[in-house]
Structures are given as structure tokens and as C-alpha cells.
């Protein structure tokens, strides 16, 4: 309750901030550096309220990222699940959910049927309802998701640098004049994550660095794949970024030993997400929708994942998993028990 009282002064501003984009809010600052930094926090297309929530979370010390990244988080969850007696079958991609007489009865993997009492679909919901069943599913909330979803996409660039950058900040923002172009997008600035002080990210004396270029470039990369220029286009982008960064950081010139470029097609292949998107834009004037974890037409079918509660993110994905299991327990007259690992 005391926390709610502290938030009261902010409440009158929420409607106005929700109707303004993060870009528009950032443009209100005179200092170029502040404007560019604010544009990179949540993405320019989000509403300004999303920016406020993110900044408040960080300022309160209540936000961060999983140690080792999302993959390490998934590995830890998998280990805990297996320690509890659960079984995981790796390197097997589900082709479709089996439905008989209006009930989900299992999944098909490479022409092998695995029967189950219930199925919880955790792949991107938007992708699942279109591709994981004999026919695309059509329910009111699914149609709403198809219509309203504004996918977040990026092209992610990673560099392995044979230089110790531990004397530099963990995050740096560089502006470019003139800008450079890739996949039809103009890049005026670049936010660089510097992992020099993180153990295990690079050999001793070396540095791993990453940067995300936001923008819907799915169709461009898809076309490049079709034309056969995909790998060359990725190489050209990496070389452009390396050249531009070397002009800002002379100590990395000729020191980049390895690079990797992940496009929306990479995310699509690796994670099975809709157009390779990993979150949903909540733009100005948008009212975030919370979608059901169950199907109205198919029994024993449950959904979980970041797409169910825009804008998404790892915490949302975990929460929706918990919700799906609570529905499963309700439907099977099972008492839901949840406790943190000891």
C-alpha cells in the first residue's frame, strides 16, 4: 500500500505518456546525447509509458538480465526441472499438436506420435496458432492477436575483440555522421554492450561486444536468402560496423578476431518465433491485451509464452507458464503447489 501512495503523483501523467511515443518524448530534450540514449532504452516505437516503467525498474534496482544470458537461464530451469524428475527430449522439433475429437492428445515429432494427457504450447503463440495444427486455429482472442501484434525485430551483431576494453563503460552509445545503411534501414547511432569485465565471455585479455540494430528487416533478409546474397549481406554489415566502431575506438582496429550476425531469420529458425520477433511493441495509444492461456474449442490445450502478455520479455514468459499450469491443475482437480527452489 505504501508503494501505491508513492506512485500517486505519477498517475495523472500516465494517459498523456501512453499517447506519446518514446521517440516523441526523447525529442523533447535539447541535449543530443540524452535524446539518443532515451531512444535506445525500449525502442522508439514504444509508448513513452513503457520507457518510464523501464527506467523506474532500473532506478529501483528491481530490473536486470539473467546471468549468462537467456540461454543460461533456460539451462538452469531445465536442470531444476530434471532434478525434480522431469524428462526433456532434446533435438526434436514438434511438427504439430495432435487433436482428436476436440481434445489435444499429444504431439507429432518426425512422424513419431507422442501421446499426452495435455499439451502446453510454449512456442510463440502467434506462430503456433498458424503452423502447429492441421489447420490454423481461429478463436476471437487469436484473431485479435493476429490483428494487433506489432512485432519487435532486430539484427544482432556480436564481435570477439582481441583487446581488453575493461577500462571502458559496460554500455556505450556512438552517433554517426554520416549515418550508414543496411537492409533499407538508416543507422544514426549504435549502442554497444561491452562484456570485458564479465567472466567467461571471452579469453583473458579479450572482449566480447554486442549490439542490436532495431527495425523490421525480416522481408529484406528473407529476400536476400532467396537471392543467395544472405551471407554476403551479413558480412558487409559486420564489416561496416567494425569499420565505424574502429573510428570511434582506435584500440579495436584490426583486433576483431570473430564476428556473428543474427538476423530475424536466425531468431525464427532458432526460436520458432513469428518473423523472428521476440517481443511485441506497445505503441502510443495502444492498450496492452492479455490473452487467454486456454483454447475455447480444444480441451487439454494450453498456451504460455511472451506473446500472451505484451510487451513480453522473460518474466512475462515465466509468469504465463505458471498461469497455464494453474489452469491445467484446475481442469484436472489438482492442487497447484508452487515454491521457490531451495
What are these regions (language model features)?
Residues 1-50:
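Rossmann-like flavin
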Residues 306-332:
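A conserved FAD-binding loop/helix module that cradles the flavin
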Amino acid at each position: 500500500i505504501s508503494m501505491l501512495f508513492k506512485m500517486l503523483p505519477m498517475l495523472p501523467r500516465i494517459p498523456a505518456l501512453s499517447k506519446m511515443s518514446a521517440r516523441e518524448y526523447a525529442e523533447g530534450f535539447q541535449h543530443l546525447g540524452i535524446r539518443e540514449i532515451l531512444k535506445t532504452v525500449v525502442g522508439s516505437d514504444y509508448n513513452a509509458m513503457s520507457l518510464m516503467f523501464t527506467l523506474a525498474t532500473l532506478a529501483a534496482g528491481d530490473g536486470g538480465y539473467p546471468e549468462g544470458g537467456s540461454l543460461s537461464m533456460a539451462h538452469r530451469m531445465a536442470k531444476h526441472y530434471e532434478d525434480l524428475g522431469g524428462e526433456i527430449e532434446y533435438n526434436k522439433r514438434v511438427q504439430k499438436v495432435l487433436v482428436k475429437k476436440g481434445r489435444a492428445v499429444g504431439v507429432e515429432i518426425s512422424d513419431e506420435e507422442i501421446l499426452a494427457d495435455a499439451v502446453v504450447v510454449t512456442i510463440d503463440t502467434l506462430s503456433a496458432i498458424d503452423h502447429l495444427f492441421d489447420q490454423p486455429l481461429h478463436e476471437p482472442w487469436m484473431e485479435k492477436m493476429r490483428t494487433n501484434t506489432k512485432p519487435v525485430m532486430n539484427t544482432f551483431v556480436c564481435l570477439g575483440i582481441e583487446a581488453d576494453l575493461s577500462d571502458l563503460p559496460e554500455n556505450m552509445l556512438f552517433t554517426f555522421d554520416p549515418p550508414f545503411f543496411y537492409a533499407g534501414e538508416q543507422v544514426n547511432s549504435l549502442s554497444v554492450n561491452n562484456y570485458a569485465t564479465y567472466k567467461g565471455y571471452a579469453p583473458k585479455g579479450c572482449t566480447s561486444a554486442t549490439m542490436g540494430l532495431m527495425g523490421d528487416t525480416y522481408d529484406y533478409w528473407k529476400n536476400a536468402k532467396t537471392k543467395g546474397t544472405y551471407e554476403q549481406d551479413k558480412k558487409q554489415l559486420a564489416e561496416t560496423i567494425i569499420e565505424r566502431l574502429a573510428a570511434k575506438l582506435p584500440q579495436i582496429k584490426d583486433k576483431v578476431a570473430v564476428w556473428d550476425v543474427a538476423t530475424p531469420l536466425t531468431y525464427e529458425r532458432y526460436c520458432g518465433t513469428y518473423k523472428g520477433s521476440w517481443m511485441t511493441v506497445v505503441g502510443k495509444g495502444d492498450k496492452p491485451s492479455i490473452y487467454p492461456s486456454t483454447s475455447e474449442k480444444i480441451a487439454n490445450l494450453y498456451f504460455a509464452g511472451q506473446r500472451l502478455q505484451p510487451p513480453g520479455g522473460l518474466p512475462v514468459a515465466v509468469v504465463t507458464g505458471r498461469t497455464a499450469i494453474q489452469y491445467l491443475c484446475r481442469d484436472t482437480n489438482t492442487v497447484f503447489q508452487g515454491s521457490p527452489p531451495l
